[in-house]
């Protein structure tokens, strides 16, 4: 079966693994997925991410993060811009997620950025997802 939205698939795999408190998960790799995973790591939503070469597409192994009492760090993930309905914002329209408690991930001309980084650089782009 052809996958129409690999980013949504990655976010769903993270959401599902997080709900059952798995330590790690694997997703097929791509440059965009790798950059999104690096942002999640940098922002403290996941513990680590590593790329595994398999002479094909490659695999991203994502290590999930939980609090001291095994509470989830990621409480929500939502895909915003979809293949059937793209969502673009201008620099002054970059959204805040839960008043700054979450992040919006944007695809801009300067790469994949968080909402905060996009505001600092004064750039808009495609809103990929919200994470909180």
Swiss-Prot record:
Keyword field: Ribonucleoprotein, Ribosomal protein, RNA-binding, rRNA-binding
GO BP terms in the entry: translation
A cellular-component GO term for this protein: ribosome
PANTHER family, alphabetized: 40S RIBOSOMAL PROTEIN S15A
Role played: One of the primary rRNA binding proteins, it binds directly to 16S rRNA central domain where it helps coordinate assembly of the platform of the 30S subunit.
Pfam families: Ribosomal_S8
The family this protein is said to belong to: Belongs to the universal ribosomal protein uS8 family.
InterPro entries registered for this protein in UniProt: Ribosomal_uS8, Ribosomal_uS8_CS, Ribosomal_uS8_sf
Species this chain originates from: Geobacillus sp. (strain WCH70)
Single GO term (MF): rRNA binding
Subunit structure: Part of the 30S ribosomal subunit. Contacts proteins S5 and S12.
Superkingdom of this protein's organism: Bacteria
PROSITE patterns in UniProt: RIBOSOMAL_S8
Record's protein name: Small ribosomal subunit protein uS8
